[in-house]
A protein has these predicted regions:
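Short, compact, well-ordered microdomains
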Residues: 73-116
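Conserved mixed alpha/beta catalytic, RNA-binding, or beta-rich assembly cores of soluble enzyme
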Residues: 1-68, 92, 109
C-alpha cells in the first residue's frame, strides 16, 4: 500500500469542493492512473495563500512547515498538485512551486496533476 495526498490552492477553496480530484482518485483516472486499489489517500493540504493575504513565504510559514513534517511522519510518498496551481496563462504559482520543492527536499514525490488540466 502506498500513501498519497493532494496539494491545492488555498484561494481555490472559495469555488472548489475538490470533487474532480477525489473522483479522479476514486476512479484511478487521469493523473491517478496506475495506482493499485489499496492506495490510500492520506492527506489533503493547501498552500499558505497569496502574498497579498499572507506575507510569509512557505519556507518561513510555521503552518506549511508543520504540514510537511506531518506528511513525512504519516509516510505520505506522493503528493498530487491540483490544476488550481496554474493561473489563466497556465503558469504555476511561485508559492506552490516552492512548496513542491520543499516536499521533494523531504523525499516526497510530486506529481503535477490530479484530474484534467
Amino acid at each position: 500500500m502506498i500513501k498519497i495526498g493532494t496539494l491545492t490552492c488555498l484561494h481555490s477553496n472559495n469555488v472548489c469542493a475538490r470533487v474532480g480530484c477525489l473522483k479522479a482518485f476514486q476512479n484511478r483516472s487521469d493523473f491517478f492512473e496506475g495506482y493499485s486499489l489499496d492506495t490510500f489517500l492520506g492527506a489533503m493540504m493547501t498552500c499558505n495563500g497569496c502574498k497579498s493575504t499572507n506575507p510569509k513565504e512557505p519556507d518561513e510559514d510555521e503552518g506549511i512547515l508543520e504540514k510537511i513534517d506531518r506528511l513525512v511522519s504519516e509516510e505520505i510518498k506522493v503528493m498530487h498538485v491540483g490544476a488550481c496551481r496554474l493561473d489563466g496563462k497556465k503558469k504555476e504559482c511561485p508559492r506552490i512551486t516552492r512548496i513542491c520543492e520543499m516536499l521533494e527536499d523531504r523525499g516526497i514525490q510530486v506529481v503535477r496533476g490530479t484530474h484534467r488540466e
